């Protein structure tokens, strides 16, 4: 028996100790909560053991190439047709979907925000999502959105699935228990989790703090996968064995519940009389996973110069243009800086890609002041960015001995599409009006005469 969860609660430490995972990225897994619940040798028996129903969940067209073909077979207490009734319109006004061209008065520019403050009212995860940027078009399955979340209440009898895209969740403050229909994941800051498109889940709080905060990348396009390593070879970066998929778990609950759906940018809700998280066994390769960012094995320059930040890519969602991502998930983890005769922080840059950044903890080496844990920044396509004046002076004059950049974890959602700012983000009280001043100290040093200045 792998794992059975009935009415899993947020504060159940014993249950947390029992959570189990299966290692690997994109594997064809199999798992059962009750012995004999998983059929052997076929997918759809005439009658399933325990009176379960067989159901397929497809994450790709049937005819997708084998390398990108994704599906899982679920064996559940009720088929999913019993998990929805007649829908009513629902409203989550701060969760926006591309294309979204909100009207606001904030002009184009480099932007940075302090953390969103804890809510004064009671909010669950769905109610706590705030969209910062959108890019592309969800109805054509292109682009992404960058969200922040802040909440303080469990989704006890509320459940959700997103038909518009997969959700990459990045906790910053407070651990989460993510209960999906295919299993349970405990996810803490410096870990991430991914919930595939269309998969039912709810999120519970874990821990004793008063608010939970983090970031979400909603990927409308091709699903996240591991980037190619090229000349790096067979190892390093995010290794497949470090991705963890939950074993089967189910919630056997007969009471009024609400199922919320996001579909083409609109929200709907329906009421049912039981929990939809009723998968007792499953097998396949379309599944949620978690990943500990601290297991990322960085590579870098070991003699001189600063390499491109693409070497820090954890996951990439590709497009038809090779090497051009719908969205990349990139981190800036602890690492040694050893390059000689080199300006070691990230260099000044203008980019075809648009960059949304967040900081989970510590300091970011290009912005030691002003960019704080829980904060955000946005540098859209072709807008210049780079180290602030303080970081430049410090790095330009530092003794170039080996230095470990430690106790830090920043990340970036980077997309080929321009990221449109929402009205909420443009008017957010934590927007730093003085952000551009961080570069004011970068004065002219050129005087026409040769030599280091």
UniProtKB/Swiss-Prot annotation:
Report the Pfam families cross-referenced here: HgmA_C (PF04209), HgmA_N (PF20510)
Record text on subunit structure and interactions: Hexamer; dimer of trimers.
Q: Which domain of life is it from?
A: Bacteria
The positions flagged as active site in the entry are: 306
Q: What does this protein do?
A: Involved in the catabolism of homogentisate (2,5-dihydroxyphenylacetate or 2,5-OH-PhAc), a central intermediate in the degradation of phenylalanine and tyrosine. Catalyzes the oxidative ring cleavage of the aromatic ring of homogentisate to yield maleylacetoacetate.
What EC number(s) does this enzyme carry? Answer: 1.13.11.5
According to UniProt, the name of this protein is Homogentisate 1,2-dioxygenase
- Per UniProt, what is the name of the gene that codes for the protein in this document? hmgA
Q: Where is Fe cation annotated to bind?
A: 349, 355, 385
Q: Which InterPro entries match?
A: HgmA_C, HgmA_N, Homogentis_dOase, Homogentis_dOase_bac, RmlC-like_jellyroll, RmlC_Cupin_sf
Q: Which family does it belong to?
A: Belongs to the homogentisate dioxygenase family.
């Amino acid at each position: 028996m792998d794992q059975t969860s009935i009415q899993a609660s947020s504060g159940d430490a014993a249950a947390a100790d029992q959570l189990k995972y299966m290692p690997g990225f994109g594997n064809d897994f199999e798992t059962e909560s009750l012995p004999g619940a998983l059929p052997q040798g076929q997918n759809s028996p005439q009658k399933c053991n325990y009176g379960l129903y067989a159901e397929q969940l497809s994450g790709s067209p049937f005819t997708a190439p084998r390398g990108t073909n994704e599906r899982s077979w679920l064996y559940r207490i009720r088929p999913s047709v019993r998990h929805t009734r007649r829908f009513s319109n629902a409203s989550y006004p701060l969760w926006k979907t591309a294309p979204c061209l909100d009207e606001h008065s904030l002009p184009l520019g480099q932007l940075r925000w302090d953390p969103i403050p804890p809510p004064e009212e009671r909010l669950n995860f769905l109610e706590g999502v705030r969209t910062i940027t959108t890019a592309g078009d969800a109805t054509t399955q292109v682009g992404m959105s960058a969200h922040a979340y802040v909440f303080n209440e469990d989704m006890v009898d509320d459940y959700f699935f997103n038909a518009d895209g997969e959700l990459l969740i990045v906790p910053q403050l407070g651990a989460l228990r993510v209960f999906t229909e295919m299993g349970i994941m405990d996810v803490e800051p410096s870990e991430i989790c991914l919930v595939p498109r269309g998969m039912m889940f709810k999120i519970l709080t874990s821990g004793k703090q008063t608010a939970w905060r983090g970031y979400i990348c909603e990927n409308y396009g091709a699903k996240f996968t591991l980037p190619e390593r090229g000349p790096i070879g067979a190892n390093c970066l995010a290794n497949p064995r470090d991705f963890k998929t939950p074993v089967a778990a189910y919630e056997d609950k007969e009471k009024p519940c609400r199922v919320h759906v996001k579909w083409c940018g609109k929200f709907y809700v329906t009421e049912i009389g039981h929990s939809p998280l009723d998968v007792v066994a499953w097998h396949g390769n379309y599944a949620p996973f978690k990943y500990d960012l601290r297991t990322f094995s960085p590579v870098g320059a070991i003699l001189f110069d600063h390499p491109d930040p693409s070497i820090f890519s954890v996951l990439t969602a590709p497009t038809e243009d090779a090497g051009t991502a719908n969205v990349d998930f990139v981190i800036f983890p602890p690492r040694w800086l050893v390059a000689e005769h080199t300006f070691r922080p990230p260099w000044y840059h203008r980019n075809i890609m648009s960059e949304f950044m967040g900081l989970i903890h510590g300091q970011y080496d290009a912005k030691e002041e002003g960019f704080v844990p829980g904060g955000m920044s946005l540098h859209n396509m072709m807008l210049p960015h780079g180290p602030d004046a303080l970081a430049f002076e410090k790095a330009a004059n530092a003794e170039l001995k080996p230095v470990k950049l430690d106790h830090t974890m920043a990340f970036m959602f980077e997309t080929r599409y321009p990221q449109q700012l929402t009205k909420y983000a443009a008017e957010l009280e934590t927007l730093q009006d003085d952000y551009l001043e961080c570069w004011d100290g970068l004065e002219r040093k050129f005087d026409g005469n040769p030599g280091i200045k």
